[in-house]
Amino acid sequence: MRKVNLKDVPEQERKSPKGKFHKFVKNISIALGREPESLDLAKRHPFDLAIVRIPKRKSYCPYHSHSAESELYLVLSGRGSVRDKDGSIIVTEGDAFLFQPGEAHQLTNAGDEDFVYYVIADNPRSGGSGDSCFYPDSGKWAVVKEGLEEVIVKGKETDYFDGEE
């Protein structure tokens, strides 16, 4: 058995240059021994578990969808706004919701206190999982280059055989 207490899991902070996006993440799966870059299933978990904290009036990240990853959310405290293709709804403590591959979403703190939730992902983006993210508002893609390194690209529509023959 592997065991860890949340108070012992380091919290990682990340925010955008202008501050619109700001989050604190405790990656529980890594604390339990998951090797992020390993393709060996014995060194990976079948899912990723993290606890996320978003400060007031901030968003986790831009509106996006995953190509191969499903994400299950469980709100622990605070008040959040969840945007999807149909608009935005408010979620609070005890609410659970799921996004499957191709379903664009964005989580934002809609309250005066931190918005805190668990997220469980079935297909971690690290390693060779093949997941990528699409950002509909900007037309960008995030793809895994090597290990955990992401490359952000913005393409234009082209013919399938362009540059191939």
Label each PLM-derived region with a short phrase.
Residues 1-46, 137-165:
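A short, N-terminal "cap"/entry segment at the start of jelly-roll beta-barrel domains
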Residues 32-36, 50-66, 101:
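Conserved short histidine dyad/triad with adjacent acidic residue
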Residues 38-43, 61-66, 108-110, 134:
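Short histidine-centered beta-strand/loop micro-motifs
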Residues 51-55, 65-84, 122-124:
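Short, conserved beta-strand element in jelly-roll/cupin
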Residues 72, 79-81, 88, 104, ...:
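Structural motif
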Residues 86-102:
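Short acidic-glycine-tyrosine-enriched beta hairpin
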Residues 101-127:
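Ligand-binding loop in jelly-roll beta-barrel domains
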